[in-house]
Amino acid sequence: MVYGVSKMANKNRKNLKPVKSDRKDRISKNHSKKKVNKNSLKKVATTDITVNANELNWKSVDIPDTLDDFGGFYGLEEIDGVDVKVVDGKVQFITKDNKNVKKEPEQVEEKDNIVFQEDDEDVNMDELIEFKNFDDIKEGELSAASDDEESEFHVSTEEEGEEGEEAEDQEEERSEKENVKGEAGTVVTEDQTNDDLLQSNVFSSNVDIDDQEPPVLPEWSENMDLSFTVLKGLSGLGFTRPTEIQLKSIPLALKGHNIMGKASTGSGKTLAYGIPIIEQLIKDTSNDRSIGLIFTPTRELAHQVTDHLQKVWTKMNKLNKYTILSLTGGLSIQKQERILKYDGSGRIIVATPGRFLELLERNPDLIPRFAKIDTLVLDEADRLLQDGHFDEFEKILKLLGKARKIKTSIDGKPTGSGWQTMIFSATFSLDLFTKLDKTSWKILKTAGGENNEMEQVLNHLMKKIQFKSKPVIIDTNPEHKVTSQVKESLIECLPMERDLYVYYFIMMYPGTTLVFCNAIDSVKKLNAFLNNLKISSFQIHSSMAQKNRLRNLEKFKEQSEKNSKVGKPTILIASDVAARGLDISGIKHVLHYHLPRSADVYIHRSGRTARGDNEGVSVMICSPQESMGPLRKLRKVLSTKKSSNPRKTKWQNDVPMLPLEPDIVSQLRERSKIASELADDEIATKSLHKDDNWLKKAAEELDIELDSEEEEKDQFLARNKTKKLNKQLEKNENKALKYQLNELLKMPLRKDLRKSYLTGGLTNLADTLVKHKGHNSIIGHDKVDALQTLKGKKHK
């Protein structure tokens, strides 16, 4: 029998349609068309079947473990494709599908509802594959179709109106399955038995070391027992020696100890827990069991951790690209569920708690799978376990722990004792989480009076996490909360001049700069402000879609590489969504547009620079009101523990002021003012348009008329709208300001405007211009570096 069924939807019997001989678009132009006698195909329609309730093939409803109460209903059964009618007070069940009726021993069930009778003389089975145009056939599709069973031929019969998202998802699923089958482009041999054997042992024999030279990494191999695969991956990435946290934690983790690790930002904590998990993955001979589960507080950090581990794992193993898998919100949950069903996928999971809990609730069958893990990791654990952030994680631990106790053994080993737990962060101090604008600085603990700080934090964490044994505490940065490679500085200004001094810093010290703001509106406004000044800037914040965040990060990295070659600045403006864990190479400066709300946020913000062995600069832009309040408390918390005499060091002298040049600031002031007005106009216009669209859409959904007077009666909406309208500019005024700003941008900046001649003064401007030396943006100014300036080296 012949059916016109798409290969990707052959399981959906609703897509079955009679084959039509007049569909020219399904027949190849390069092949001869063979006519099919219309009378040779006869459609035999099925009839309605009336049955009793006991004769139906009911399916039981499984109660998921994620539901504490199911309303008292248990033992429920359900069935699809059955109509219910009441005739003369009697209930009748009517179905058209014999599958819904229980089979009798002597009955033979038909496979399809529509049966075609064919005339062998008029129809040739081999030529029915011609229904698809050769221009639409993709590479390898014909060979894949030829491997199907002889009794079925899959030919697409989807109508043009039915194409779209469904066909797109099916094509994506097909490509994903091809990637899972062979990422390295392996050749399938005729001996299917040998092929299956190789696939089943793919992790146990991951590298052919006969043709590979062993990497020379003595500092790694002498201090810890690592496999050839990991050493080769580290060598390819250029990691010739371990960092302090890696040197102390990896040997203990390989032995199965629980670890609580504290290290400064950029010190390699990801590989400190990632390498032991990869070693477990290499030694494990199974192909479906999940080995490790890693939780991160943000989506961007989860994708970054996944990328780092994949670079170590896949450098020598071109296998399944989904072996190390990230599960985060903002991306298609259906795609993530589909990938988890592939063989060998999800051996190591990197997830955010919210999306992971959602997956467990949607598919309870995943709970026993992830309950078999060997290692649980909490990256940036202090953030995950703060009050208000722990509810989702607590539910996950409860579900996995309950399922783990039910399982008796894994490969003959008892599983009730729990899993290995590793928690890492750069901040483990309870004082760091206090709000700087609400806590009195007098009650903060003094420097040097907290010798057992890590023990206190551990006792706090053990109330929330059930460790199978007490963790080993590893603190590689006990004296400093902010790494010593970060040089801190301060700019004091009026609250309305923050934009001006951001612009000054960028022009004076061009490079790759990351600017942090406390509010999303400030991120949007500052991004528009810098774009008006012709500066390459990008933004990421929590209101953006996840794909847009990742896209902006990629654009920022690409643009920074281009601008660094010509000495131009590249700016990334972010809310605190990017403060933790993100490892963006080349960040020279971190600007705090607003003072952070807590000390731990400041530490993680500053840690986006000075990654690895590099040094960086962290600059706070602070108003006078902040200086006497939050700034004082921040410096009190961050003061060095083991200072020889901490009371004699005033908090005002703890952070040096950034040197400013008033003549340069005065030249930038007018530019900044105009750019700020244009940015306010742009943001207000977009916001008003968005509000109007939202109100219209809400009125349409409620089927009511939108009354403008009702909006005026609402004082909050009216005040907000008036505030935005006051920031808007007329079209002519907007054009005039843009023209004025462009003219100002064409004028070069000069170090000293009082000079009448190029060759006058201490600096020969003519010589500087001819020889192309000196500052790229300021004529007569030497090239300056913020790091060297703060180190004490004077530049003219």
From Swiss-Prot:
Motif (Q motif): 219-247
Positions annotated to bind ATP: 263-270
UniProt feature, compositional bias: Basic and acidic residues: 19-28
Residue ranges constituting the Helicase ATP-binding domain according to the UniProt record: 250-446
GO CC term (a single one): nucleolus
Enzyme Commission number(s) of this protein: 3.6.4.13
Domain note: The Q motif is unique to and characteristic of the DEAD box family of RNA helicases and controls ATP binding and hydrolysis.
Protein name, per record: ATP-dependent RNA helicase MAK5
Organism of origin: Kluyveromyces lactis (strain ATCC 8585 / CBS 2359 / DSM 70799 / NBRC 1267 / NRRL Y-1140 / WM37)
